[in-house]
Curated annotation (Swiss-Prot):
The lineage of its organism: Eukaryota, Metazoa, Chordata, Craniata, Vertebrata. Residues 1-22 form the signal peptide. One of its GO terms (biological process) is regulation of insulin secretion. InterPro entries: Antimicrobial_frog_2, Frog_antimicrobial_propeptide. It comes from Lithobates palustris (Pickerel frog). Antimicrobial activity against Gram-negative bacterium E.coli. Stimulates insulin release. This is Palustrin-1c.
Amino acid sequence: MFTTKKSLLLLFFLGTISLSLCEEERGADEEEGDGEKLTKRALSILRGLEKLAKMGIALTNCKATKKC
């Protein structure tokens, strides 16, 4: 139970940091007004979220099968 809470806390922390960085980048992109850069940033954010989701799924699978 403790390791599950620790893992979820880590995922939450990493997600919060990622979101914070995304908001800063979004603010900078809005000032520039360049649509192409915004699209590239959105794609990089989605890739980061995909990696985070894969890590969460792998962790959940590991905990469910108890093969950690």
